Amino acid sequence: MPSPTKAAEAATKATATSDCSCSAASVEQRAPSNAANPSSSLATSGKIGGKTQDQTAAINKQKEFAVPNETSDSGFISGPQSSQIFSEEIVPDSEEQDKDQQESAPQKEQPVVLDSGIIDEEEDQEEQEKEEEHQDTTTATADSMRLKHSADTGIPQWTVESHLVSRGEQLNNLGQSSSTQITGRSKVQSSTASTANANPSGSGATSSAPPSSINIMNAWEQFYQQNDDGDTPLHLACISGSVDVVAALIRMAPHPCLLNIQNDVAQTPLHLAALTAQPNIMRILLLAGAEPTVRDRHGNTALHLSCIAGEKQCVRALTEKFGATEIHEAHRQYGHRSNDKAVSSLSYACLPADLEIRNYDGERCVHLAAEAGHIDILRILVSHGADINAREGKSGRTPLHIAIEGCNEDLANFLLDECEKLNLETATYAGLTAYQFACIMNKSRMQNILEKRGAETVTPPDSDYDSSDIEDLDDTKMYDRFGDPRYFVSYNGGNPMTVA
């Protein structure tokens, strides 16, 4: 009799086949009872006499599947088929979820970059042009200018070798819009034009003009920067006396106000040109629109400094009218940016306002020239309308008082002989005329000269004090006594603050 375990295993395998018929299922149910006796199965088939042979064959075939031998089971139905069933039930669901997630997630488009190679060619061309420009600028002559603090970085050779007029041709005139004087800039323009012609459609590449080493539109920003002392290259050029460099720097200035930049001691390029006795540079600066009334830290203008130094050419450069040739040259050189009003006013008025400017000591140009004994300077100033009777700001002395104080007979004779507007009776702030001042100073020779020229011989007062001055003197002594800090120190060892 078969064991119940094998019968149950056979029943389980039979239920896994879903495509079997109902008759086969009924035979499978009878299989456990007939498995022990094969003859009984034949009897059973004999009982089913009404069935056809095909049905009988199907029943026998079903028996073979229902009751297999122990060695006939390959595990195909129990193992792989069952795993395939589970995989068919689970895996499709996970795949469908992955597909849904992929469809719901947005797809990022990757940009497509098309390199035509034109940009690389332009960059190589720019590098080659920069190398050529660097070679052109580094081939400077032995007398090239070198400025302080590396202020000449990038200065091309044309700036150093430029002149006001060279063989009748104008150099570096910024007023000409079509000017292509910088070699590097012309090369860049030609290369840009060739690139545009080579690629007229402009498809796939963007062509732009590469910047030159020095942009002529903002070159003044580089050449008008101040160093640690506040000096610009124009200041340094005025000190060195290089007229050509000064003219080139002036042409770069878009406005005359750049010519009035002051250094740390409030000196403009015009001040430095006066201190170094550069009349030609002073004339060029004035024609270009430089302001002659700017003061330094002591209140001196360029004319004050020239009067102190006794430089006649510099004084003439600051006071004489401009000729027609100079005005025409100024308009030709600097007319593109110079203030026409400034040029016209300088050419028809001889700077009378500058002649009467006082410095911070209250002295005018005539006082400074008289103190230094520069008769020629005084002659120039008087010929241009300077006030010879002007009083200085401290004590009210005139140039005649200064000549008497210094016992300068030559200066006194010049004032008395050549200055028609000289007033001998002009008094100081103390009310002393020139003759009275000579009496107080015990200048007998000067008194005789003044008497011969018609000065009033009024003696000065014997004393400047009256009865009230004695009381004032007593008050002064009282103040000197109690105002002395040592007085309070001796008073119980105190000090002025504790006693007060």
Curated annotation (Swiss-Prot):
GO terms for cellular component: cytoplasm; cytosol; neuromuscular junction; subsynaptic reticulum. One of its GO terms (molecular function) is NF-kappaB binding. The modification Phosphothreonine is found at residues 183, 293, 319. Residues 1-43, 190-212 have a biased composition (Low complexity). Residues 69-86, 171-189 have a biased composition (Polar residues). It is found in: Cytoplasm. The modification Phosphoserine is found at residues 45, 144, 395. Residues 1-148, 171-212 are annotated as: Disordered. Residues 118-130 have a biased composition (Acidic residues). GO terms for biological process: antimicrobial humoral response; dorsal appendage formation; dorsal/ventral axis specification; dorsal/ventral pattern formation; negative regulation of antifungal peptide production; negative regulation of canonical NF-kappaB signal transduction; negative regulation of hemocyte differentiation; negative regulation of Toll signaling pathway. Pfam families: Ank, Ank_2. ANK repeats lie at residues 229-261, 265-294, 298-327, 361-390, 395-424. Activated IKKbeta phosphorylates cact. Keywords: ANK repeat, Cytoplasm, Developmental protein, Phosphoprotein, Repeat. Expressed in ovary (at protein level). Phosphorylated isoform A binds to dorsal (dl); inhibits dl translocation to the nucleus and therefore from binding to DNA. In vitro, interacts with IKKbeta. Interacts with cactin and kappa-B-Ras. Involved in the formation of the dorsoventral pattern. It inhibits nuclear translocation of the dorsal morphogen in the dorsal region of the embryo. Acts as a negative regulator of the NF-kappa-B (rel) signaling pathway. Cact is degraded by IKKbeta, this is essential for NF-kappa-B (rel) activation. Belongs to the NF-kappa-B inhibitor family. This is NF-kappa-B inhibitor cactus. It comes from Drosophila melanogaster.
